[in-house]
Amino acid sequence: MNIRRAHEKDIPRLIELLEQVLQIHADIRPDIFIPGTTKYTNEELAEMIKDDTKPIYVAADDDDICMGYAFCQIRQQPFSNNMVPFTSLFIDDLCVDAKTRGQHIGEQLFEYVKNEAKHLGCYEVTLNVWSGNTSAEKFYEKMGLKTKERQMEYILM
């Protein structure tokens, strides 16, 4: 397996994997997510691939087929004046193809992202997990992540 930055040729495969992630979220929150859609379009992915502040890392097999990805964003913190300034690498989305889960691809991808964050001078790696996505929560806890903050909601409908 080779972990590298995404290329434009990866876009069709990224779309397939984005569909898998969307379905997980739609199963958890059908009131918010629309099945059969994706978070990004082909055009948006093409722009993101060129943007060094939004690196997309892919785990490719020996045939250079993308088996998983990590969409990342470099963010400057803080959100307010009462915090020390620092750089954070936010994982916007991480996915491993359902057919290849359990082969430690996600672990290798996450370790790669952590090393990239160190190389970029980041203080931390952060991400969000939807409540109800217990397999993702368990995976990230296994990788050493701890809850930083919780966002709560009250649905009015």
Could you say what each language-model-derived stretch is?
Residues V58, I65-Q73, C95:
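Conserved beta-strand in the GNAT
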Residues E107, E111, H119, S131-E149:
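Conserved active-site alpha-helix within GNAT-family acetyltransferase domains
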Residues E43-V58:
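A short helix-loop-beta-strand connector motif used in the catalytic cores of GNAT acetyltransferases and
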Residues K118-N128:
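Conserved GNAT acetyl-CoA-binding A-motif
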Residues T126-A136, E153-M157:
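Conserved beta-strand-loop-alpha-helix junction that forms the acyl-donor binding cleft
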Residues D93-V96, G102-N115, K142:
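Conserved acetyl-CoA-binding loop-helix of GNAT-fold acetyltransferases
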